[in-house]
């Protein structure tokens, strides 16, 4: 007889109306992980201005997101992800860890470069900060267009050419994608709104990656509305003056 699954509930940051999903890449990351695991779960949005008594009791002063697994409360996004990968494991649930360690770090400096770019108000520094962001995006593009070891035919003398894989670590979404994609989505939305910047078409690997990701429900349906992201960055994004 199959072991009964404990109740799983993910508490995430609510949007401006206190009900819909707000801007939080960590919340989206865990939302994606649970969806990809194929586990039955509930998502509860928490209005940070008006935390209910139930939420306060479960996680007093705790940072969002947090997870209720049965009667256990889990905090810290990285630890929650590790916990879910350990308890929701094969054969009943898919393993989501990337095969290639490099996939876990690909593109991870993009968000820091983006933050520096968007928070800058000095026009004299803008070009260099934009170049820094472009350089980080180019590194990701190179990774996405370079064949993974498993794509290389050792017996062939021919050049393997450009990788056509859909995601960071192959044709299936992994924990690496759950970490990177929510951040890349924020970069796209905020840069377009506050800097008129879009990811260059020349970065075909990045565009292919995003196109494949938006075609997946686990990513597209967990994204907050663009307006929520824009609102979250309204005070953060500095006007150039």
From Swiss-Prot:
The record's comment on protein family reads:
Belongs to the chloride channel CLIC family.
Instruction: Tell me, in a sentence or two, what this protein's role is.
Output: In the soluble state, catalyzes glutaredoxin-like thiol disulfide exchange reactions with reduced glutathione as electron donor. Reduces selenite and dehydroascorbate and may act as an antioxidant during oxidative stress response. Can insert into membranes and form voltage-dependent multi-ion conductive channels. Membrane insertion seems to be redox-regulated and may occur only under oxidizing conditions. Involved in regulation of the cell cycle.
Q: What is the lineage of its organism?
A: Eukaryota, Metazoa, Chordata, Craniata, Vertebrata
Q: What is this protein called?
A: Chloride intracellular channel protein 1
Q: PTM N6-acetyllysine: at which residues?
A: 13, 119, 131
Provide the effect of residue 37 to A.
Decreases glutathione-dependent oxidoreductase activity
What the entry lists under CDD domains is as follows: GST_C_CLIC1, GST_N_CLIC
Q: What is the originating organism of this protein?
A: Homo sapiens (Human)
Kindly state the tissue distribution recorded for this protein. Expression is prominent in heart, placenta, liver, kidney and pancreas.
